[in-house]
Amino acid sequence: PIMTLGHFGGSTGDAALVEVLFSAGMLAGSGILAATGGFRNKSLTMVAAIAGFGVVAIASGLLGPSLFAVFLPASFLMGACSPLYAGTQTALMQEQIPPEYLGRVFGLYGTIMAWAMPMGLAAPSVFADLLGAPLWFVGSGATMVLLAMAMLLAPSVRNVGKRDTGRIQ
């Protein structure tokens, strides 16, 4: 909403449309993941999703105020990247963690995510209010691309997603 209302000068209806398109993208990304299973190496699916989201976020941040119509499909694409990462990460955890620990690991993971979410929403709001939403999109997108590159360069990350690897002992 900050990008739509502030940078593009849109209405609350425009902000709702962006959210609907992001959600539709999530459904499409989920369908793609369900139909294909992602790349053979699951970690590459996660890397591609992070990099894809980052590239589209950078492009969105560079859009001029009159290019709201371009932001709409970009929102769809960012939404499509989300389940490609999250769904693949969940599948990797289920494959790699011994069943007797899986419930505890998912419980801890859920707790950490629930704790981090308010902070993850508050920090960007403050940043966007101070420096503008476009700069936040560019900065966070660049960070995501760098993270994806670091993941791709790390042998431990590249190898964990291979279908022929065993469980973590």
What is the role of each PLM region?
Residues 1-169:
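C-terminal transmembrane bundle of multi-pass solute transporters/carriers
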